[in-house]
UniProtKB/Swiss-Prot annotation:
Stored InterPro entries: DNA_bind_arc, PDCD5-like, PDCD5-like_sf
CC per GO annotation: cytosol
Top-level taxonomy: Archaea, Methanobacteriati, Methanobacteriota, Thermococci, Thermococcales
UniProt keyword Disulfide bond present: no
Family under the similarity heading: Belongs to the PDCD5 family.
GO molecular function: DNA binding
Pfam families (alphabetical): dsDNA_bind
The protein's name: DNA-binding protein TGAM_1196
């Protein structure tokens, strides 16, 4: 009887360890995929943005990472669709940032 309980405990422990290792491996793979995707995005940004525009996007990324991510994804889509023919300068990037920020901005109203 005690041996059966001990055997069940060992099996449960092994199952938990196996499940933990699988989750850890899946998490590592997800991190690796995210890093590869970010490297591809960075390479495209170097191609399509002027140095000033890249610098601005980097500063935006520090303050509003979700906005910077949206801008990067929009620019990547435009680049892949062949709609970006010349490098985007700082002024154009400002306009793009303003448009995307206006679309995603939420307005808060406090009623008394």
């Amino acid at each position: 009887m005690a041996e059966d309980i001990e055997e069940i405990r060992k099996r449960k422990l092994m199952e938990l360890q196996k499940r933990y290792l699988e989750q850890q491996k899946a998490q590592e793979e997800a991190i690796k995929r995210e890093m590869e995707l970010q490297a591809q995005i960075d390479a495209i940004m170097r191609k399509i943005l002027t140095p000033d525009a890249r610098e601005r996007l980097g500063r935006v990324k520090l303050v509003k990472p979700e906005l910077a991510r949206q801008v990067e994804l929009v620019l990547v889509q435009l680049y892949q669709a062949g709609q970006i023919r010349e490098p985007i300068d700082d002024a154009k990037l400002k306009k793009i940032l303003a448009q995307i920020d206006a679309r995603t901005r939420r307005e808060f109203r406090i009623k008394w």
